[in-house]
C-alpha cells in the first residue's frame, strides 16, 4: 500500500478572537466558509495532506482561542509547533496592534527557529479596512516574516499562504529531507504524534513519524 504521507508536522493559527482563524482553517482543509462561527474554546485542530516538492506532507493545523482566559492553555501548544500564522483582521486596527504581543508570546514559548507568516485576514472587507496593506508589509519586514492578505470568504491566498508556510518548515528541516529523498522508504526518526490530543480524520498509523 502506498504511503499516505512522508512527514507530519504541526502549524498554529494565533491572533485575537474574531480575526477569522477558524474560517481560514475550514477554508483550507474543507474548502468551506461560514460567515459565523462559535468562538474557539481552548484549541481545536484539523488535518490535511499536501504535496510540496515531491514530499507528501501531513499537516496538523491547530486553531487557538484568542481570548485572554485561554492563553495559559494555548501557550502549551507553541513549544511543539514547526510553523505559526500570526493573524490580524484588516478591519480591526486593534488586532493589528496586538500582533506585537503575539510575536512576544511566540518568542517566549515557541521553539527557536519556528517558521512564521503574518496574515492580514478579511481582505474582502475593503470598505471596512483600518489597516493598510503597506502597514502589514512593513510589520512583516520588521519581524522577518512573509506576509499575505487573505480572505476565507473569497478564498484569496488561502492555499498560497498554507503552502508557503509548509515550504518554509520543509526548508528548515532540509537535512531530514535529504535522507527522505535518497531513501524513499526511510521514515524519519522523530517524535511520534500523540494520539490523545485529538481525533485525526482516520485511524492512526503507528508507523508514521512527525516533527511535532
Curated annotation (Swiss-Prot):
Q: Where is the lipid attached (S-geranylgeranyl cysteine)?
A: 210, 212
Which GO biological process annotations does it have?
exocytosis; protein transport; Rab protein signal transduction
* Cell compartment(s), UniProt: Cell membrane
**Positions with a binding annotation for Mg(2+):** 22, 40, 63
Q: What is its EC number?
A: 3.6.5.2
User: Which cofactors does this gene product need?
Assistant: Mg(2+)
Q: Output the Gene Ontology terms for molecular function.
A: GTP binding; GTPase activity
Any one Pfam family here would be Ras
Cysteine methyl ester-modified residues are: 212
Region (Disordered): which ranges? Answer: 192-212
Name where it mostly resides: membrane
Source domain of life is Eukaryota
Protein family membership: Belongs to the small GTPase superfamily. Rab family.
Domain note = Switch 1, switch 2 and the interswitch regions are characteristic of Rab GTPases and mediate the interactions with Rab downstream effectors. The switch regions undergo conformational changes upon nucleotide binding which drives interaction with specific sets of effector proteins, with most effectors only binding to GTP-bound Rab.
Subunit field text = The GTP bound form of RAB15 interacts with REP15. Interacts (GTP-bound form) with MICAL1, MICAL3, MICALCL, EHBP1 and EHBP1L1.
Report the protein name in the record: Ras-related protein Rab-15
What high-level taxonomic lineage is stated for the organism? Eukaryota, Metazoa, Chordata, Craniata, Vertebrata
Amino acid at each position: 500500500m502506498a504511503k499516505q504521507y512522508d512527514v507530519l508536522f504541526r502549524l498554529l493559527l494565533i491572533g485575537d478572537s474574531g480575526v477569522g482563524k477558524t474560517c481560514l482553517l475550514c477554508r483550507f482543509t474543507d474548502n468551506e466558509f461560514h460567515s459565523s462561527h462559535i468562538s474557539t474554546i481552548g484549541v481545536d485542530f484539523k488535518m490535511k495532506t499536501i504535496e510540496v516538492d515531491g514530499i507528501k506532507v501531513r499537516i496538523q493545523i491547530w486553531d487557538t482561542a484568542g481570548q485572554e482566559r485561554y492563553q495559559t492553555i494555548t501557550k502549551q501548544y507553541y513549544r511543539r509547533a514547526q510553523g505559526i500564522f500570526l493573524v490580524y483582521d484588516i478591519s480591526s486596527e486593534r488586532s493589528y496592534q496586538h500582533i506585537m504581543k503575539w510575536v512576544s508570546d511566540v518568542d517566549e514559548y515557541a521553539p527557536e527557529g519556528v517558521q512564521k507568516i503574518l496574515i492580514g485576514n478579511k481582505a474582502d472587507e475593503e470598505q471596512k479596512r483600518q489597516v493598510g496593506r503597506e502597514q502589514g508589509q512593513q510589520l512583516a519586514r520588521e519581524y522577518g516574516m512573509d506576509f499575505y492578505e487573505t480572505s476565507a470568504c473569497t478564498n484569496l491566498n488561502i492555499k498560497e499562504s498554507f503552502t508557503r508556510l509548509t515550504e518554509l518548515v520543509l526548508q528548515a528541516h532540509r537535512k531530514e529531507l535529504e535522507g527522505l529523498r535518497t531513501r524513499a522508504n526511510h521514515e524519519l526518526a522523530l517524535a511520534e504524534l500523540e494520539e490523545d490530543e485529538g481525533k485525526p480524520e482516520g485511524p492512526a498509523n503507528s508507523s508514521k513519524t512527525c516533527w511535532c
